[in-house]
Swiss-Prot record:
Pfam families: GHMP_kinases_C (PF08544), GHMP_kinases_N (PF00288). This is 4-diphosphocytidyl-2-C-methyl-D-erythritol kinase. It catalyses: 4-CDP-2-C-methyl-D-erythritol + ATP = 4-CDP-2-C-methyl-D-erythritol 2-phosphate + ADP + H(+). ATP binds at P110, V111, A112, G113, G114, M115, A116, G117, G118, S119, A120. NCBIfam families: ispE, PRK03188.1. InterPro entries: GHMP_kinase_C_dom, GHMP_kinase_C_sf, GHMP_kinase_N_dom, IspE, Ribosomal_Su5_D2-typ_SF, Ribsml_uS5_D2-typ_fold_subgr. Keywords: ATP-binding, Isoprene biosynthesis, Kinase, Nucleotide-binding, Transferase. It comes from Mycolicibacterium vanbaalenii (strain DSM 7251 / JCM 13017 / BCRC 16820 / KCTC 9966 / NRRL B-24157 / PYR-1) (Mycobacterium vanbaalenii).
Amino acid sequence: MSARDGNTASEWVPTGSVTVRVPGKVNLYLDVGDRRDDGYHELTTVFHAVSLLDEVTVRTADILSLEMTGEGAESLPTDERNLAWRAAELMADHVGRSPDVAISIEKTIPVAGGMAGGSADAAAVLVAMNSLWELGVPRRDLHALAAQLGSDVPFALHGGTALGTGRGEELATVLTRNTFHWVLAFSPGGLSTAKVFAEIDRLRAEEDRTLPPRLESPEPVLAALASGDPAQLAPLLGNDLQPAALSLDSTLRRTLRAGVDAGALAGVVSGSGPTCAFLCGSAGAAVDVGTELAGAGVCRTVRVASGPVQGARVVPSPSNAG
């Protein structure tokens, strides 16, 4: 049924807009199993939401539309190929309405950077529409909708730090004491998640290829997070996809080396890359590392961030003006 079919639609859908902020993620630990028959890989990962936030505003409208500005926005589709668009359609379908909203996204999370920016925006649309339309869809149902959109979308709702299993969509909250401080190095280009997974499959199939040992258990990482000690966490950061990302973009080796040379405790490729995340001992150390890394000429740009932060949340409106 279309939202226009009933004469109560205008009463049911308030006018105005809702803005949601949503974080990017870093994978502190990413154990990638062999390719399954369905084409997916079994994952065990520790997600960590960091203070690099996209801002998504959803307004009532006559027709579904999407506009994007900011970090890498010009390279992104603004139609049904975009996960945020599909999130609007899915949410509307879930409640039996037409997806008549205008979505505006201000990007800060890098595009195709291994920080799940597209997934974050999709999660934000679900939260924004739930609020804008006053639906009261419970969190567990939002999580189920998020999992239909993609394996990183549920964590963008969840935020904080979480252990992800399955394809990454099954989440358990992880106790994290303390705030951890990060420097994020953005690469000039992006890496396709599908290509990185295909590359790790290819590398593993080469008999004469020596890869780093696969990750075995997230338990030491969870213990380090509970301790709140960045020095304990640093040597445990790991990513089974890192050899594939380095194979596809060899410049990342220089970036990783430069970050540690600048004073980071450790560096890791985030998810499928190419963003590199550097753990630092303090907020001040992160600023120093970021400054030095920015001048080293090994990445496009540098951001300082901290985590964990909460997942997709409505921004309180400073006024009632729509």
